[in-house]
Amino acid sequence: MLNSAMSVVILAAGKGTRMYSDIPKVLHTLAGKPMVQHVIDAATKLGAAQVHLVYGHGGELLKQTLKDDKLNWVLQAEQLGTGHAMQQAAPFFSDDEDILMLYGDVPLISVETLQRLRDAKPQGGIGLLTVKLDDPSGYGRITRENGKVTGIVEHKDATDEQRQIQEINTGILIANGADLKRWLSKLTNNNAQGEYYITDIIALAYHEGREIAAVHPARISETDGVNNRLQLSRLERIYQAEQAEKLLLSGVMLRDPARFDLRGNLAHGRDVEIDANVIIEGNVTLGHRVKIGAGCIIKNSVIGDDCEISPYSVVEDAHLEAACTIGPFARLRPGAELLAGAHVGNFVEMKKARLGKGSKAGHLTYLGDAEIGDNVNIGAGTITCNYDGANKFKTVIGDDVFVGSDTQLVAPVTVGKGATIAAGTTVTRNVADNELVLSRVPQVHKQGWQRPVKKK
């Protein structure tokens, strides 16, 4: 069916006392992203013309964190219930648009479920998302008459008979803007909590002869809210299990799906293998036949075909061409670039550095602010000394250079093509093509040398 224009209200004013945190509840992260951001993203994908965020506690931190110019910030200075929260947003509703109500602490709600709810909303009525629970204790019950939804009764206000009802309200609903404003104006706080319940609009709509269509989500977990860290951790595992399942079904070999975390977006080729305890953050692309070893962290990086990243390596904001090998225990920091066939071994760190085709830095090396040519060998313990305490300087190494172990390259410095730098050398001046450079203190031998003896 053809949908009307739609705006979304996200309720995010709660303090989250049971989180025992100074951070507003909705800013606690799931899969590396604030819970409320998951909800905002779902609203955006659904095509919301406007997203109204109702906030209260921690408003400044919310604004600093979300930084979304498209959000309409609505202050709820006092938390007097969900109906009261919606009343604060009501002046922004257009009469001819639908209003979808969501919650900042219900992060797993899917676009697909919301679209079905939107499609099911009757003309002039309400679309209501409900679920059936074996133990509905604490939740508002859906009352029906001859199969039709007639209202919602909060648990504290329910009779013993009503508490036997298993169908409960998730709090997510959609209604026309003009209708919603009219119903909101009629809410009272005559209940056990002394609050204004948005759920009371269901009975108001029913008594006007309006239809209420109940829709169930694809998965109950979509409507699970978070009140404490235990609940958040459970939703994290549910989310990660879903992501792992999608990747397995799309051809990625996860050696242990229960020990894999996706905290962003992963694009991948064919025959990718990922071992246990790998974390993917931000936007990551893995080419064909890429292998990621156990315990690696890959963030905002592009990994080319046939690359292999050995265990416990960290790759952040880096770009690897085809057939590169990394680690184990390597660290590629922002700006690291490896051309085809390059190798970075154990305990090597790169930042703002390019390693040319077929070049190798095998062990215990720091390469920062460096441009390294093709077929270069970087010996163990080599350091580009790029920082003088105030400014960074660049090291340039040409093709086919051999850098011996324990070399210090004091930038700014350029090493020409084919040059050889002997082990233990400190390079402070430019080196010409094909030169041999060495700087060593003369070796001294003292026969019969005795070590000092500790004084008694």
UniProtKB/Swiss-Prot annotation:
Binds 1 Mg(2+) ion per subunit. GO terms for biological process: cell morphogenesis; cell wall organization; lipid A biosynthetic process; peptidoglycan biosynthetic process; regulation of cell shape; UDP-N-acetylglucosamine biosynthetic process. Residues 251-456 are annotated as: N-acetyltransferase. Its main location: cytoplasm. Residues 1-229 are annotated as: Pyrophosphorylase. Keywords: Acyltransferase, Cell shape, Cell wall biogenesis/degradation, Cytoplasm, Magnesium, Metal-binding, Multifunctional enzyme, Nucleotidyltransferase, Peptidoglycan synthesis, Repeat, Transferase. The keyword Metal-binding applies. Coiled coil: none annotated. Pathway: Nucleotide-sugar biosynthesis; UDP-N-acetyl-alpha-D-glucosamine biosynthesis; N-acetyl-alpha-D-glucosamine 1-phosphate from alpha-D-glucosamine 6-phosphate (route II): step 2/2; Nucleotide-sugar biosynthesis; UDP-N-acetyl-alpha-D-glucosamine biosynthesis; UDP-N-acetyl-alpha-D-glucosamine from N-acetyl-alpha-D-glucosamine 1-phosphate: step 1/1; Bacterial outer membrane biogenesis; LPS lipid A biosynthesis. Its EC number is 2.7.7.23, 2.3.1.157. This is Bifunctional protein GlmU. It comes from Salmonella schwarzengrund (strain CVM19633).
